[in-house]
Amino acid sequence: MNTEYAELHCLSNFSFQRGASSARELFDRALRHGYAALAITDECTLAGIVRAWQASKDTGLPLIVGSEMHLENGPKIVLLVENLTGYQALCTLITVARRRAKKGEYRLLLEDFDHLPGGLLAIWLADIEGDAQACLAQGNWLRERFAERLWLGVELHRGADDEQRLADLLALAQSLAIPAVASGDVHMHARGRRALQDTITAIRHHTTVAEAGHLLFANGERHLRSLDALAEHYPDWLLAESLRIARRCTFTFDQLQYEYPHELVPKGQTSTSWLRELTERGIRRRWPRGLSVAARAQVEKELALITEKKFDSYFLTVHDIVEFARSQHILCQGRGSAANSAVCYALGITELNPEKSNLLFERFISKERDEPPDIDVDFEHDRREEVIQYIFRRYGRGRAALTAVASTYHGSGALRDVAKVLGLPPDQINALADAFSRWSDSLPSPERLREYGFDAETPILKRVLALTGELIGFPRHLSQHPGGFVISEHPLDTLVPVENAAMAERTIIQWDKDDLDLVGLLKVDILALGMLSALRRTFDLVHLHRGKQWTLASLPGDDRPTYEMISRADTIGVFQIESRAQMAMLPRLRPEKFYDLVIEVAIVRPGPIQGDMVHPYLRRRNKEEAITYPPKLKSVFERTLGVPLFQEQVMEVAIIAADYTPGEADQLRRAMAAWKRHGGLDPHRERLRTGMLANGYDADFADRIFEQIKGFGSYGFPESHAASFALLTYASCWLKCHEPAAFTCALINSWPMGFYSPDQLLQDARRHHIEIRPVDVRYSHWDCTLEPLDHPDSTRNLAIRLGLRMLRSFREEDALRIEAARSKRPFADATDLAQRAGLDSRAAEALADSGALRGLIGHRHRARWEVAGVEAQRPLFDDVTSEEVQVTLPLPTVAEDLVADYATLGTTLGPHPLALLRRQLAAKRFRSSQDLLSLENNRTLSVAGLVIGRQRPGTASGVTFVTLEDEFGMVNVVVWRDLAERQRKVLVGSQLLQVFGRLESNNGVRHLIAQRLYDLTPLLTGLEVRSRDFQ
């Protein structure tokens, strides 16, 4: 007799730190063994079920949806989904259990089962070793609620008492008149994962493997066993029962019906008619002179496709969210593929006119592609929460939630957890973690381990590294997506379980953002963008001080001084083109118009660089190489000089040259994005080549196009995305050029954001001759503000007054009390300030230490003395006076002020630290950033500077870019991979860095190619300078 079996109790690695195998591994192994079906029953979660469904579809092995659950003061059960009703009931049950507990836990109560609908089958995992009467009571309780849908699970794992255990379980089932079924309590796909299963068990219980004892399984039998092995353990009829259960479980995710909310539609309208009405209103606003024939045709095409795909309500919802933000004066802008849409532009969701941008709508929505659109909208980063809470209020927490992100184990984090439970001491764990690359999950080489004092051949180290390698990539927990919202017409917990997020007032669904497309859920991304906060604040400051009310749309376009500033790479603080790599590209590309900015935003990316597209484009732009492309592809290549730089261009080439449909072209884009991880490009190679040859293109051109597509990998940048970002790039550059004080002030008030610290932004402002005034309790507000200059130039220029937000650890509420008290009358002295503003000693000392009392009391030493003498107000002793002791305190030295400035403010308005060290550095023949401007190419030299940034972008093939700052400006340093590996401690740990290397100078771009690094941080004598690393 052939054994047949369906595994009904199996955990994947989405039972965090319990399951030791992925769904893909489990399905592959179950298929190999000849199982009839496989249930994934992760504990009180469906977080991994969509991936299990994908594995099921790929292998052809049926998936049974289920979940293992432990009831509080009740039985342990496995629930299996029989049909759609059962699936909805399971989602609701998990939601109830998760929402009443803190993040990462659940509480399932007996009363949760009192009114459970049908559609769920239950396998009872009875505790027959405990109280017999309690066990019978649990069985009766379950039988009353599940009746003919209850089985007793029989799980045998080669224990010494298996025979007796089987007899006891069968006797229990007989006494309760319920059927029994074989199940495996599977935790791994193969026996070889037992060591990892032991390891993650110890991690979960915060112990070591050596001390875990009975927390670990006695053997490795909780894997997917062969049918022959199962037949040795279980009677045939127990195995056959699993098939009867499996046949009852007919639910698939194709049965889910998802609807977007309808309540935004007024009476007398449908979602289709209301979307058209809003679109026509937007057209009259966006195109006051009327639409062109081509634009009208595009709008009609889009509206027809939106209706055909039943996306009308989705667009209405996004429009509603954007309108709310604008009603609250929150700056926002849609981006990404939505910028391809004329309807999105008309609705005010995006700011890019697709009629002028030649963008490809099929990149956004395609008739052939049965997938929902994905609209990303950026909001001011410090006001996005207002938008998020509006969505929760508008739709209710039952119908709106954020998507999850499955946070996974990475190199050093996995290493630390594994090494700890295997008993390594903390100092060795730290050293091992340091040996891991900061930039990848690959295990350290034997050579690198030796450098850090380890012998790679020792058994314990080999075991630690092997287990770390297995754990890397495993899901560790669910975190929340930065802003992806799922909103539904019906309760979300009938589609997917919902649980509490780590942040208060937020809830998340249990599915990762990448799972949504597979099940057809629509997501709108409510994203945070710091530059929008800075731009809005700049507009407000300009309006306050100049009377001008700028908007993104009203800023003058094609401004020559702005583009000249950009071409000089004078772009510290602006959007997207402020990194060292971008700044190195700017003098070579020399943008002159808006589309040049679109190119600039996109070209310094892994896709164009790895596809060898950057240098050909620059040569053609600089007329060093002929611009060539087939005449039929002029509409595709003319704007990028014959070099494909964008995903949309690849799609257009496939459509025009190889007869792809728009939907097929989008499939090519998706295959292109995923081929390095999953393959899938090979079918397109032959399809493209054959199609292009049939249409008269030569083989070399076809092969070159395909190689460039491969080069894009997963990094191809959408033109629509680049164009949307370029709008903000231009706006920030225009404001930096024409309103530098307001722009810098707004950047600091919006921090943390961007690439540079407030210190670096202020140093840049000073180099641009903007006056910076110190924090002063007599004038400063919480935010930095603008003040008129005292000289006649004041009609055009403004000074920045630093705000109390600059003081480290100073509270905003203290600042607001200071403002309120000062508005009534000026402060007389430290006592008056402390008493009227209600400041405690901590706040008063912070003001003194930072120099904020200099104008009221005097220098830091005197201010600190005065503050120390201020006593809290005591009404009982109001009439008692104490004699004041007069003390003369010395002025702080320049160096003391410098150290105190950085310690309390993170910046200084005094001399730059390097200015104080310049004589000492010059004696050692160190060059300054100013010197480098006049030195010839290939000169070897030494420089020293404060490390203000370290970058290792994916474009750079292991190169680290370091930015040093001295009193004159910045030095760009290139550190090749081998030097970075050899001197990692110096590279990563230095605050003041000496670099010996070779100067490269080309087209106005200067780099120092590092040959040796030295840590000069001790010269700073207590000065702490923070760099912005690896952004």
From Swiss-Prot:
One of its GO terms (biological process) is DNA repair. InterPro entries: DNA_pol3_alpha_NTPase_dom (IPR011708), DNA_pol3_finger (IPR040982), DnaE2 (IPR023073), DnaE2/DnaE/PolC (IPR004805), DNAPol_HHH (IPR029460), NA-bd_OB_tRNA (IPR004365), PHP_dom (IPR004013), Pol/His_phosphatase_N (IPR003141). Keywords: Cytoplasm, DNA damage, DNA repair, DNA replication, DNA-directed DNA polymerase, Nucleotidyltransferase, Transferase. It is found in: Cytoplasm. One of its GO terms (molecular function) is nucleic acid binding. GO terms for cellular component: cytoplasm. Its EC number is 2.7.7.7. It holds the Pfam family DNA_pol3_alpha. DNA polymerase involved in damage-induced mutagenesis and translesion synthesis (TLS). It is not the major replicative DNA polymerase. NCBIfam families: polc, PRK05672.1. This is Error-prone DNA polymerase.
